[in-house]
């Protein structure tokens, strides 16, 4: 009877996307729950490409089988822009990004947040030990992933940030939306084409989906100064091509696993008001993934 009562007390969360079958978020949040004692259950919520809103709404209204109510979800590709439209209220960073990766099902209306940028900043500064303040930074891509991290990166005060994209017009639109924030923090913010984005950056972040498709790195090696940090938001096998490219050109390659864990911790805090410890979870997850790849 106690086990059944404990299950009924667990609030439900999920990761919503297409696809989500291989998502590591359930592992991460299960570890966060164990470390914090928070009573949650976290699963996967596959959404058809034309049915994101309906699927998430049905999940929010469901009661579950032997579990508590649905309280929120993470949102992954390709629905981060759609998630904004479902919310009654946006956090400032979700409003600026116009993309959300976290929904909270409050009784007075759904709340949307974007924790990607906070996760990336913490991974770079804490886990990689690289300072963003005063650095020169190239952010490659202008889709939902880039939109989610641009604001938090600007808030750290880099000297210069260039947003490079296959379509420069799309990059310019994102730059214009963030111009006031860049000015507030004294950052030179520019848009550029992939083949004309400068050289010698301290930090290069790949926010494109090129790695997922097995495509080559969309910029030339001249963007890397010797010893630069080169980070791909992907992880596991998808990131290996980028990491090999970085190493071959004298850069320190890093995948997106630390960002994944840190954005999850930020989501957990948004939902529960508790900030879980992350170093042990990151180490455990990396061991699991590297073990699966051997």
Curated annotation (Swiss-Prot):
Pfam families: SDH_C (PF18317), Shikimate_DH (PF01488), Shikimate_dh_N (PF08501). Its EC number is 1.1.1.25. One of its GO terms (biological process) is chorismate biosynthetic process. NADP(+) binds at residues 141-145, 233, 256. It comes from the Bacteria. Keywords: Amino-acid biosynthesis, Aromatic amino acid biosynthesis, NADP, Oxidoreductase. One of its GO terms (molecular function) is NADP binding. It catalyses: shikimate + NADP(+) = 3-dehydroshikimate + NADPH + H(+). Shikimate binds at residues 23-25, 76, 101, 116, 235. HAMAP family: Shikimate_DH_AroE (MF_00222). PANTHER family: BIFUNCTIONAL 3-DEHYDROQUINATE DEHYDRATASE_SHIKIMATE DEHYDROGENASE, CHLOROPLASTIC (PTHR21089:SF1), SHIKIMATE DEHYDROGENASE (PTHR21089). Involved in the biosynthesis of the chorismate, which leads to the biosynthesis of aromatic amino acids. Catalyzes the reversible NADPH linked reduction of 3-dehydroshikimate (DHSA) to yield shikimate (SA). This is Shikimate dehydrogenase (NADP(+)). It comes from Methylibium petroleiphilum (strain ATCC BAA-1232 / LMG 22953 / PM1). The gene is aroE.
């Amino acid at each position: 009877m106690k086990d059944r009562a404990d299950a009924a007390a667990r609030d439900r969360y999920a990761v919503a996307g297409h696809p989500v079958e291989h998502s590591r978020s359930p592992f991460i949040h299960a570890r966060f729950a164990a470390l914090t004692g928070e009573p949650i259950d976290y699963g996967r919520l596959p959404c058809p490409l034309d049915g994101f809103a309906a699927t998430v709404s049905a999940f929010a209204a469901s009661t579950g089988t032997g579990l508590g109510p649905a309280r929120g979800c993470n949102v992954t590709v390709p629905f981060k822009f759609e998630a904004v439209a479902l919310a009654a209220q946006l956090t400032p960073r979700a409003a600026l990004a116009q993309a959300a990766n976290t929904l909270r099902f409050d009784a007075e209306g759904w709340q949307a947040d974007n924790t990607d940028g906070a996760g990336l900043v913490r991974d770079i500064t804490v886990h990689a030990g690289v300072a963003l303040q005063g650095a020169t930074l190239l952010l490659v891509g202008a889709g939902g992933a880039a939109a989610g991290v641009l604001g938090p990166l600007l808030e750290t005060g880099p000297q210069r940030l260039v947003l490079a994209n296959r379509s420069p017009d799309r990059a310019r639109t994102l730059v214009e939306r963030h111009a006031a924030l860049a000015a507030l923090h004294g950052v030179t913010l520019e848009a550029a084409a992939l083949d004309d984005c400068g050289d010698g950056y301290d930090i290069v972040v790949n926010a494109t989906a090129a790695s997922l498709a097995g495509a080559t790195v969309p910029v030339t090696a001249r963007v890397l100064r010797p010893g630069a940090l080169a980070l791909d938001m992907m992880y596991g096998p998808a990131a290996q091509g980028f990491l090999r490219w970085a190493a071959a050109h004298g850069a320190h390659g890093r995948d997106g696993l630390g960002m994944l864990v840190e954005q999850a911790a930020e989501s957990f805090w948004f939902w529960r008001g508790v900030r879980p410890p992350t170093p042990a979870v990151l180490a455990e997850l990396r061991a699991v993934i590297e073990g699966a790849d051997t």
